[in-house]
Amino acid sequence: MGSLSPLSLLWGLLLLQGVLRPLRGDPVFIPPFIRMSSPEVRATLVGGSEDVAVSLSLLQVEEGVLPVPTCGGRRNETVDWNVTVSPRESTLEVTIRWKRGLDWCSADETASFSEPPCVLQMLLVSASHNASCLAHLLIQVEIYPNTSVTHNASENMTVIPNQVYQPLGPCPCDLTAKACDIQCCCDQDCQPEVRELFAQSCFSGVFGGHVSPPSHHHCAVSTTHQTPDWFPLLCVQSPPSTSPFLGHFYHGATSPRHSPGFEAHLHFDLRDFADASYKQGDPIMTTEGYFTIPQVSLAGQCLQDAPVAFLRNFDSVCTMDLEVHQGRDEIVLENMKIRTTGGPVTPTVTYEEAIDLDKFITSPDTVLSVGSAPRNVNVEEHYVFRWQNNSISGLDITVIRAEISAQQRGMMTQRFTVKFLSHHSGGEKEFSGNPGYQLGKPVRALHTAGMNVSTLHLWQPAGRGLCTAAALRPILFGENAFSGCLLEVGIKENCTQLRENVLQRLDLLTQATHVARRGNSDYSDLSDGWLEIIRAEAPDTGADLPLSSVNGVCPEVPARLSIRILTAEAGSVEGVAQREILAVETRFSTVTWQYQCGLTCEDKADLLPLSASVEFINVPAQMPHPPTRFQINFTEYDCTRNELCWPQLLYPLTQYYQGEPQSQCVAKGLMLLSLLMLAILLRHPWVRMCKARDSAAIYH
């Protein structure tokens, strides 16, 4: 058996020491050995951390000589290292940081993967008390030069690209900051010599950075793809600014970006709105920077500094721990000024007190200290912008606050809404489209009895998810959704009363009697496209059913509500498809509720889940046309199966072409017809016939 190297023997002794010391209650580093490849590492010293001094030394491992661990101060050879000790509860957190950083390693632009590490050392961290060694931490440092790190931070201002023409992240496969991602050819952090290694296996499609692929009808495609001979005659000549993929990635959600702790942060100047005018989707600016409101990202996290886009309504719900809550409660909204045309706009702020804290705060069973100072937290913030042309004319903010104890514990649910209203709109209901519905707009509804009902609803659970604390949110057109809540039921619950209670809660979601066929139907005129809701017969709540007399069992409980909405495309306005509602049906489904007992059946409240779902079903506006004899016999000329489409040869001259005004299409068609007739008349047979006719006239 071969002999062990000094480094392996030292590592084994320290590891054995780290395992045995906690058993005796002695101080020990966790972990006792670290292989360091980044500029910073951390370890924890546990057990007897009072009056302990931490020192760092550099081990000179020579072949055949095992260095003896010593406890002492910093030596000259460790001036490149920094040791920070942070006390924790009964422990010490030790941070070892390399002062030079990765920039010193990547200074040589000609570095390659085959070069040795720029830092190769062995460090020993010692904990001592009164010159007596207590514990040791061995660190093997191997830091390699990062050839993918580039230093192009010459600009001091960030340029946010227009998302209408490209997504905010033009290289989706660039997942690592300041580092080269393999097979990601659009990653600007990759050096040319590194990119050559995987140039033949780059990621394709949108993930690889091809966020705006050329259309297959574009003339530039013929240079890169195999195209038929007639393609140059029928291809489309258009600049990239009119690509059919514009705006395809525009409506994206916010996603967080995590940066390493050693990354250099530069100060970026904000975008200069000299004219203070906005376009749809532009971030709203204040006199101090971007106007931000917490929003939920794609990963489900709550981003505290997410910009608000102009004319983009949203409703976000964030959940946070009250113990570490550092929210927006200290922000003075009255001092905020919105930049816009005509000068800054000062918001009008209204404060209200929350009535039921159980809807917002879920507290554990803990006893709070008596006499602690209270504090205010914002549980809801509602922002209503008034816009006119390309500017903001006003901002109304409603803040719902709650007063809680300073020692309050638990989870708090916060809600933030942003709504844009026209400057000329009053208290009337907002349209959901003109005339057809827009995707994501509320389904308009009314009650013939004059009740204040404007839409259909689903549940928005909060806290423990109980129905008593659940809020309501509108049903949005074109978005299938499922929601639910929990109803507390006792073991001795009366089944008839339970059915009536459940049915009443489900009816609250669909109090309306009619829904609007179009997005701009008039609320004051019932004949202006209002459809009566088709309601399936609800189950009889007072029926005497089997098992109804048994405690803890209730059959035929209407616990599920399904809403089906039939929609169709009813034409187009200026080339934009207009969608409308054909019918709305509500139907109940029953379940058998049974009290869930453990080892013993105690008289405690059980939870009955109630659910409500909405489904949008698209119905064709007209039956599809049967295939013609030409399509059946000549499948190679079928427009739906082949690139070549002879029936659409004159498509620009038909009424279906909406790329240009019809008058221009007619003028171009007549000009083309005139040129065609002139070409036919000037052909050789016609010229010869004219010459023959002239010769015959001369002889006569």
UniProtKB/Swiss-Prot annotation:
**Glycosylated sites:** N76, N82, N146, N156, N389
Under the heading InterPro entries, the entry gives:
Tectonic (IPR040354), Tectonic_dom (IPR011677)
* Disruption of the gene: reported phenotype: Mice have ventricular septal defects and can display right-sided stomach. The embryos exhibit microphthalmia, cleft palate and polydactyly. Embryos lack also nodal cilia. Cilia in neural tubes are scarce and morphologically defective, and failed to elongate axonemes. Basal bodies dock to the plasma membrane in Tctn2 null neural epithelium. No Arl13b ciliary staining in defective Tctn2 embryos perineural mesenchyme suggesting that, as in Tctn1 null mutants, defective Tctn2 cilia lack Arl13b. Tctn1 and Tctn2 share a common function, with both affecting ciliogenesis in a tissue-specific manner.
According to its UniProt record, in which tissues is this protein expressed? Answer: Significant expression is observed in brain, kidney and eye.
User: Which ranges sit in the Cytoplasmic compartment?
Assistant: 683-700
Quick one: a GO cellular component term?
ciliary transition zone
User: What's in the keyword line of the UniProt record?
Assistant: Cell projection, Cilium biogenesis/degradation, Cytoplasm, Cytoskeleton, Glycoprotein, Membrane, Signal, Transmembrane, Transmembrane helix
- Superkingdom, taxonomy of origin: Eukaryota
**Coiled-coil features, chain-numbered ranges:** none
How does the record say this protein sits in the membrane? Single-pass type I membrane protein
Record-level GO BP terms: cilium assembly; protein localization to ciliary transition zone; smoothened signaling pathway
One Pfam family from the record:
TCTN_DUF1619
Residue spans crossing the bilayer: 666-682
Q: What is its main location?
A: membrane
- Per the record, ranges on the Extracellular side are 26-665
Compartments, as annotated in UniProt? Membrane; Cytoplasm, Cytoskeleton, Cilium basal body
Q: Which PANTHER family match?
A: TECTONIC FAMILY MEMBER, TECTONIC-2
Question: How does this protein assemble?
Answer: Part of the tectonic-like complex (also named B9 complex).
What the record says about family reads: Belongs to the tectonic family.
User: What exactly does this protein do?
Assistant: Component of the tectonic-like complex, a complex localized at the transition zone of primary cilia and acting as a barrier that prevents diffusion of transmembrane proteins between the cilia and plasma membranes. Required for hedgehog signaling transduction.
Instruction: Tell me the protein's name.
Output: Tectonic-2
Q: Which organism is it from?
A: Mus musculus
